[in-house]
Amino acid sequence: LSTVKKIAEGSVATQTIYVDAVNGADSRDGTTQAKALQTLSMALQLTQYARKAVIYLAAGTYTVPDKTLTLLGRDVRIYGDTAATTTLQGNLVCENSFLLMRRVTIDSTDSTTANPTANTITLQYRAAIRMVDCTINTAGKNAINITEMSNANFVGTTIRGASQYAVYVRGLSDAKIYTCTDETTKGVHAGGGSVVYINNATGASFPYTNDSSEIVFVDGRQVLPKTTTVSDVAMDSPN
């Protein structure tokens, strides 16, 4: 009954939940750090009807249900301790939802806890994500796949791995990449009427490709379409 009551209360208000993978327990209600839950799964269950779910993760490793966390029409904010100490294992799918993540590492490289051959993060049908001071570890496909009029904003985030692209944007979507680090080989691709902004990138400087009708801005300047991968530092080259 207490769990049912908690879910009912969450349907009418913003709900804040604390989770601690090391010292928490799912028998608690998660309302304070001292009463922290142990799993992200229970935190998502208790906040499933909240208009806004705010989840604080203590340092530790967390897994998502069935390897993929799917958010449908939800508003979820997840705050970690630091990206170096707070790891979320699995893949994320956001559909018509808003997801904010700060100071968290998303890792989809282990087949026991994730689907390594899939996109690490997928945004579809007007979804939105904001990632600040995060790390994304990807084994296959794209680190972030953005489609169907969705939008993404990355600040101070490092993207690693990816057999295809760090950020793949299509379907009238847009992505803003600020002071991020690219540790992939192909960087960004803009297609399908999308718009991409890259500012103050480091690492491989987010090499990009874009189709003829897509718009890419690098450090505030619009660049010409590039069908082969180039670094943003070469944007003024005629070739």
Could you describe each region identified by the protein language model?
Residues 85, 108, 138, 143, ...:
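Residues in short coils/turns that link rungs of repeat/solenoid architectures in beta-rich domains
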Residues 121, 129-131, 144, 167, ...:
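Fold-core signature of tandem repeat domains
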Residues 3-42, 61:
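Right-handed parallel beta-helix/beta-solenoid
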Residues 57, 77-80, 99-103, 128-132, ...:
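All-beta strand scaffolds that present successive hydrophobic residues in beta-strands
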Residues 41-56, 61-74, 84:
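N-terminal, post-signal-peptide segments of secreted/periplasmic proteins
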Residues 1-20, 219, 223-239:
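Glycine-rich, low-complexity segments
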